[in-house]
């Protein structure tokens, strides 16, 4: 998987893969969150990318990302709220 937004390969942690299965998030949806979702940065390399999918009932989907030489997906959340 490759992120056009960050121009890097995407690596999904085992934890994030488990959460994706539990929450019914496909690789395609995850890439859409990463590439076209809104972003909030904690610092230069840590961020939350999030996006609403109208067909889903669980509010925003969010991917917790670390930007290294690749985009590392640490976890995937649903029912995400932006404060």
Model-assigned labels for residue ranges:
Residues 1-83:
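Ribonuclease/tRNase effector modules and their secretory precursors
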């Amino acid at each position: 998987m490759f992120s056009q937004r960050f121009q890097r390969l995407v690596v999904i942690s085992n934890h994030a893969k488990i959460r994706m299965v539990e929450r019914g998030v496909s690789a395609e949806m995850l890439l859409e969150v990463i590439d076209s979702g809104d972003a909030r940065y904690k610092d230069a390399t840590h961020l939350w990318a999030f996006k609403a999918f109208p067909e889903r009932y669980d509010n925003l989907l969010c991917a917790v990302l670390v930007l290294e030489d690749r985009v590392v997906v640490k976890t995937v959340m649903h029912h995400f709220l932006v404060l």
